Amino acid sequence: MFQKLHHVAYRCRDAQETVEFYTKVVGLKYAAGEQSPEGARPYGEEVDLIHIFFECGHGSYIAFFDLPSSPPMQADPNTPSWVNHIAF
């Protein structure tokens, strides 16, 4: 059995909006962020991405990927909106 969760990651629409919300509204500490260089293949395929992390305590983080060059994400029409959530 594992001892702790290092991080979970989700996609976000806008990295800057996400930083503002999680630091100013939720009160989490911004831990790290990186933007892939043009032409980078960090996950085996060329992708434009911004990856940001927030501290949740006890060595755990919540992370987000902003994929600015990808089509906008869509909600799954077969999943009720209350299913997808984060609880602190």
Descriptions of predicted regions:
Residues 5, 28, 49, 67, ...:
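Generic detector of leucine side chains in alpha-helical contexts
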Residues 5-13, 52-57, 75-88:
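Vicinal oxygen chelate
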Residues 38-41, 69-75:
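A short, acidic/glycine-rich surface segment
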Residues 62-66:
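Conserved beta-strand in the GNAT
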